[in-house]
Each structure stands twice: as structure tokens, then as C-alpha cells.
Amino acid sequence: MSLNLDAMMTERRNPASAAIDTLSTLDILNLINAEDSKVAPAIARILPQIAQAVDAVSAAFARQGRLIYCGAGTSGRLGILDASECPPTFGTPAGQVIGVIAGGEPAILQAVENAEDNPQAAQDDLQRLALSSRDVVVGIAASGRTPYVLGALRYARGVGATTVALSSNPDSPMAPLADILLTPIVGPEVITGSSRMKAGTAQKMILNMLSSAAMIRSGKVYGNLMVDVEATNAKLVERQIRIVMEAGECDRATAVEALERSQRQCKTAIVMVLSGLSATEAQALLERHRGFIRPALDER
């Protein structure tokens, strides 16, 4: 079956870059930068829809559900990137945020021929994850018509999972399969059809919003501090200390002692410092308030 590329926004020629091959290096960069500046306003226009998606994800987390990104090529890699950052940043359990890419692990580093054209493969991948109605599936495809992503959304809808479609083409085939439709219209690319550029930038920004805002809504952030950060390297050990110092308004020695007594749990250490409770008492208080620091402290 042939595709009508002319009908797709992401495949149209951009008149602003029609002679880009004749420009100086600096002028090429100025043009790319000018086109990139259109991405944030495009996202601003769909913030209400992004908010709906965030609320759906945080609700899924509250019922022990998962956020699952599905995509092919750049779109799949961006989902994996966002998912992989959640455990160290927010202390999420393995498997709470998952990135699935057409072609599997080999496709992370290089293109896998025809992988994106197989909708059944998406169903198989989601079945292996035991997808359920508790989960949220975000299908990512700049074109809005990638068969693998369409297959993922179709299967997800069939099992009752919440479906979110992220595309840069209006009226895409993904739309009827989505409970929530995210369509940042960034316009034609500087290099025709290279949707890793503006469309990919929009995807990255929106995925940042989805996961970060959902984690904030789930109590993973206090003020603007990542209070569930895991100390997996020297930099993050130091970050934990600084977080407890700032949130607890205490000196370094107090923060270090609280972290040691709480087995390096930032939230517990913060509540200990601010309330005077023991580690066991602070942890129990946090558990009563589903890990949210503010209501835990209010109870004191």
C-alpha cells in the first residue's frame, strides 16, 4: 500500500530552508535555531491535553499501574531515554516506566529493517509485559501512522489501558485509538522528512513533562527537590546531602547523620530533621501519607 506523503505535515518541504545547502555554516545554524524556536509555542497550545495525560499517568501510578512508551526509531529511543531516567531521578521501582521500541534492543543502536511496519510485534511486546487496564500506553510517532505504534494503541485499547497518542501530524490514524491526543504542530522540518528534528524535540519536551509532572503529582518532589533520588554514584550521594540540608534547613553534619540513620532515604531523613522523629517513626508517618512529605509534616 502506497503512502500519501504529501498529506503529512512532517513530510512537507519547508520553504524557509529550500536553499539551505547554499548557506554558510552560521546561517544554517541560525535557520535551524529559528525553526526550533517554534517548538515551545506549539507545545504551549496543547498544555491542557498534556495535563490530562499527566493526571492519567499519576492516577495509574496510584493504582499500581505503569507508564509504557511505544515507538519506532527516534520516537522509540526517546521513550526509552525518558523511562531509563526515572529510577535514578525519582526512585521509581523497575518497570513502573517502560520504553518499548519496534525491533527490540538491537533497534536502540541501529535501525532494524521493517520493524516499524509490524503491528503484531507491538501486540506481542505488550503481551510480554502483561499489559492491563491499570496501565497507560503512550504511542509516539511523528507521522501518526507508524504501524507498530498503531498496533500498540489498538491492543492497549482492547485491554482497557488508557491510551495517549503523540504525533506532529493533525488528523492522524492514531487519533481514533487515543483517549488523549497530543498533537504539537511544529511545521515542516528544515530537512524534509527528518522528524528527528523539530518533531523529535517536541516529543522529548513532552515526555519530560509527562514523567516529571506525574512524579511531582505522586509525591516524588518536595518544593523543587527530587526527594526520592537514589544515591547510585558520588554525585548523587552529594546531591542527597544537599537536598536534606536545603529541605531540612540544617547543617551538613545533621543531614549526613539523618541519611545514615534512614538508610539513605531522603524523604525519611527530611521528616526526621524537621519533626525530630526517629527513622522508624518518620518512615511510618510517610507511609500513612503515601510518601507525601507536606501532609506528613502537617500531621506533626
Curated annotation (Swiss-Prot):
Induction: Induced by MurNAc 6-phosphate that releases the repressor MurR from the DNA. Repressed by MurR in the absence of MurNAc 6-phosphate.
Native source species: Edwardsiella ictaluri (strain 93-146)
Signal peptide location: none
Stretches of the chain forming a coiled coil according to its record: none
Enzyme Commission number: 4.2.1.126
Transmembrane segments: none
Family: Belongs to the GCKR-like family. MurNAc-6-P etherase subfamily.
A UniProt-annotated Pfam family: GKRP_SIS_N
Claim: Ligase is one of the keywords in the record: no
More details: A lyase-type mechanism (elimination/hydration) is suggested for the cleavage of the lactyl ether bond of MurNAc 6-phosphate, with the formation of an alpha,beta-unsaturated aldehyde intermediate with (E)-stereochemistry, followed by the syn addition of water to give product.
Record-given protein name: N-acetylmuramic acid 6-phosphate etherase
Molecular function (Gene Ontology), one example: carbon-oxygen lyase activity
